[in-house]
């Protein structure tokens, strides 16, 4: 419960009630070519960079009497044009590392001139924190965005490494690259974060996910929303949401990179994207391989020969763009991994080390297919937009060893959503969701049979967004969800017998309220500004397949969270310096635990009787004195505690005591990131710092007792040299000073490792 899970090697298949969504999608598709265009006024102009030269490829977005913000990019001469309904709108222009203040203009003007300025944190249009695209400056929730440019500058290959730059999230990796990687959002458990790839859920049944299985080679950006988001996404978004938005469309562009490094590392990727007036597409391939830890095991000096890992990924998308703003998009992704499982061979605090496992391996294969249709009801410059989505996600997992097992997750999802501008300042969204998912695993039955656990959810949601100008944004949303677990046959296993369960249904309602207010706008181009934001919401995570399979409790309910937060964003020097401070308080209720010695609290083996809380503060500082230099730092103070179980004051689940810290959540953690970009040279340095954590005995988990895991600081240094316009050489040294540490007790991190390679980019 309080999280000693290293990985759940495990499963999920689907039970589908998505037929109505298929019918809706087909009906929507049939109307795409016939929708009439609304009357529209052109809005156009030119975007210039800080040097007064045309800013090609800058993003221009307009909010006003529209269902969703209208967006375009500038051409090679910095020019843009948008067709808009008559009226006054708010225009924003931005590019990586720079933006311009929002301006109010009347549709119909074609002579606008907007000049960008260097910003420590530039504007970006986010798609994860609300039902429609929202500028970062109007987000009431805590949102961080990692761009493709930032990932490339730091030579980041994995989602786990990227998230070490985000305040409030603790990343715990069981060794080197490719090993099991978990994330803890603001003190929540490792299955409290929903991960999306272009809107498709990547989590297993019940919310678990190994981040090492989520590549970022094709990511245009990574959006991270902290705090519960079940009002938007329902189940599993109990502690936060991470979304990988892949690149597509635009001018023809192809990239390829390859590198080699210590421990026989071989990494490579290739991407291509292109688009025109009526179509857009993209494709990507990536591969990562590394031998991992190959020296003597710190626990007893024996050889470690089974710590290697491999990941292969492929993805593609193709979309059609109609003259009236219609969109049809299909996308797919495939990821498979293969890694050794030597077990814990590092710290051995209780002397229970049983030797290195030289034969066990874990294999996974994930497949995702998604279809998306958008129909503005009245043309591109419309007050109303209809959107329909359908996606399929399958995950197969196999563990090969003396106690091998197979598992699978199957999920089918359908969604219909209507977005509308009720007035020039009020936007509304409403819709319905259907999710069918199932999980199977031979581990549950300790045999060849696969127990099927099937669950469906039908939800209705609504959201209102009030934006009376460019300084204030208030968003309120709610989602009501009916979650049904199908009847489950009895399991007579002597290991963990379970009676037959009848079908079980629960209804959950989750609200969310956020507000962002620019209290003091910058009075001059080099002035200061002050922005306040607040957010409150709730979240749920229904039981995973193991929790259902190993209980005798037919009414096991979802785990729940409640959260409030407040933040202050202060900029100086026209945005070249930004300080962002947030305080938060999270309460986690109805956590599922094994009742064990807590007699009198429940008549079942497991029940929703545990509770915990987490409170803390996050501070992020960013400084960009000029376009070539950027510095960022963040610090998180986190105070977590195990609370009394329901019905037993003063008692906590074994081996905890009331007031103990939650596992693997440090009180102090932070990071520092420096980059410099010259005409042909580039350099970066990143540092991650983590304080002491409470952890479990590596070999027997919580049954072996609780132990302290020392903190650490790790530095990575790197740089790149552009030899020609299309060819760049790069190198980096991970763990440059050879720190000895363990994210997860018993699993040593890799020492100093050198990587070197090249990147080729071509565009037309």
Give the residues covered by each predicted segment.
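Membrane-embedded beta-barrel scaffold of Gram-negative outer-membrane proteins
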Residues: 279, 381-399, 518-520, 531-537, ...
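Gram-negative outer-membrane beta-barrel transporters
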Residues: 1, 467-475, 482-483, 585-587, ...
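Structural signature of Gram-negative outer-membrane beta-barrels, strongest in the C-terminal barrel
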Residues: 122, 323, 423-435, 451-586, ...
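Periplasmic-side early beta-strands and strand-to-turn transitions of outer-membrane beta-barrels
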Residues: 230, 243, 259, 271-362
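Short, acidic, small-residue-rich periplasmic hinge/interaction motif at the N-terminus
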Residues: 59, 63, 94-96, 109-152, ...
């Amino acid at each position: 419960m309080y999280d000693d899970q290293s990985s759940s090697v495990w499963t999920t298949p689907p039970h589908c009630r998505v037929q109505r969504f298929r019918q809706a999608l087909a009906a929507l598709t049939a109307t795409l070519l016939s929708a009439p265009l609304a009357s529209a006024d052109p809005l156009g102009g030119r975007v210039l960079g800080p040097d007064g030269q045309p800013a090609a490829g800058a993003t221009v977005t307009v909010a006003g009497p529209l269902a969703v913000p209208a967006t375009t990019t500038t051409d090679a001469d910095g020019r843009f044009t948008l067709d808009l309904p008559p009226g006054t709108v708010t225009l924003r222009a931005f590019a990586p590392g720079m933006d311009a203040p929002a301006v109010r203009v009347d549709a119909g003007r074609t002579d606008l001139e907007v000049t960008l300025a260097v910003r420590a944190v530039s504007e970006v249009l986010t798609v994860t924190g609300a039902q429609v695209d929202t500028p970062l400056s109007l987000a009431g929730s805590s949102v961080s965005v990692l761009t493709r440019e930032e990932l490339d500058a730091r030579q980041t290959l994995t989602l786990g490494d990227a998230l070490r730059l985000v305040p409030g999230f603790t990343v715990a990796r069981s060794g080197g690259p490719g090993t099991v990687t978990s994330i803890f959002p603001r003190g929540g458990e490792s299955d409290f974060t929903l991960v999306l790839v272009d809107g498709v859920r990547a989590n297993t049944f019940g919310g678990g996910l190994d981040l090492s299985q989520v590549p970022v080679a094709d990511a245009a950006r990574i959006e991270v929303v902290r705090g519960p988001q079940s009002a938007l996404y329902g189940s599993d978004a109990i502690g936060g949401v991470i979304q990988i938005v892949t690149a597509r469309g635009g001018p023809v562009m192809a990239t390829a990179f390859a590198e080699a490094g210590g421990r026989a590392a071989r990494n490579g990727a290739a991407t291509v994207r292109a688009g025109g007036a009526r179509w857009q597409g993209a494709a990507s391939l990536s591969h990562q391989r590394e031998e991992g830890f190959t020296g003597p095991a710190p626990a007893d000096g024996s050889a470690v020969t089974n710590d290697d890992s491999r990941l292969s990924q492929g993805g593609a998308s193709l979309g059609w763009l109609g003259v009236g703003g219609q969109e049809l998009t299909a996308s797919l992704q495939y990821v498979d991994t293969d890694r050794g499982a030597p077990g814990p061979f590092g710290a051995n605090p209780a002397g229970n080390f049983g030797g290195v496992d030289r034969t066990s391996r874990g294999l996974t294969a994930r497949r995702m297919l998604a279809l998306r249709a958008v129909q503005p009801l009245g043309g591109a410059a419309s007050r109303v937009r209809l959107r329909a989505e359908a996606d399929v996600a399958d995950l197969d997992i196999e563990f090969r060893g003396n106690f091998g097992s197979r598992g699978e997750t199957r999920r089918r999802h359908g969604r219909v959503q209507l977005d509308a501008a009720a007035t020039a300042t009020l936007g509304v969204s409403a819709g319905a969701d259907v999710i069918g998912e199932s999980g199977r695993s031979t581990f549950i039955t300790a045999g060849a049979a696969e127990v099927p656990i099937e669950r469906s959810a039908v939800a209705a949601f609504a959201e209102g967004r009030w934006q009376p100008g460019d300084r204030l944004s208030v968003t309120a949303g709610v989602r009501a969800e009916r979650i049904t677990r199908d009847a489950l046959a009895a399991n007579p296993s002597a290991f963990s017998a379970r009676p037959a369960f009848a079908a079980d249904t629960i209804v959950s309602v989750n609200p969310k309220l956020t507000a962002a207010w620019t209290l003091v706008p910058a009075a001059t181009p080099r002035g200061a500004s002050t922005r306040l934001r607040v957010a409150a919401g709730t979240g749920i995570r229904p039981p995973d397949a193991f929790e259902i399979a190993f209980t005798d409790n037919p009414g096991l309910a979802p785990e729940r969270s409640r959260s409030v937060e407040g933040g202050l964003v202060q900029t100086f020097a026209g945005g070249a310096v930004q300080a962002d401070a947030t305080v938060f308080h999270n309460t986690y209720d109805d956590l599922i635990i094994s009742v064990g010695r807590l007699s009198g609290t429940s008549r079942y083996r497991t029940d929703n009787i545990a509770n915990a809380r987490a409170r803390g503060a996050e501070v992020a500082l960013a400084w960009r004195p000029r376009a070539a230099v950027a510095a960022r730092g963040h610090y998180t103070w986190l105070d977590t505690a195990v609370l009394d179980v329901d019905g037993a004051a003063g008692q906590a689940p074994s081996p905890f005591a009331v007031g103990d810290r939650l596992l693997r959540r440090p009180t102090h953690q932070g990071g520092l990131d420096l980059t410099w970009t010259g005409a042909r040279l580039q350099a970066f340095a990143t540092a991650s710092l983590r304080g002491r954590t409470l952890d479990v005995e590596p070999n027997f988990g919580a049954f072996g007792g609780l132990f302290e895991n020392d903190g650490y600081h790790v530095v990575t240094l790197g740089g790149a040299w552009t030899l020609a316009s299309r060819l760049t050489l790069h190198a980096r040294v991970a763990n440059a000073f050879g720190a000895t540490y363990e994210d997860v007790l018993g699993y040593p991190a890799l020492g100093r490792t050198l990587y070197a390679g090249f990147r080729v980019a071509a565009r037309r």
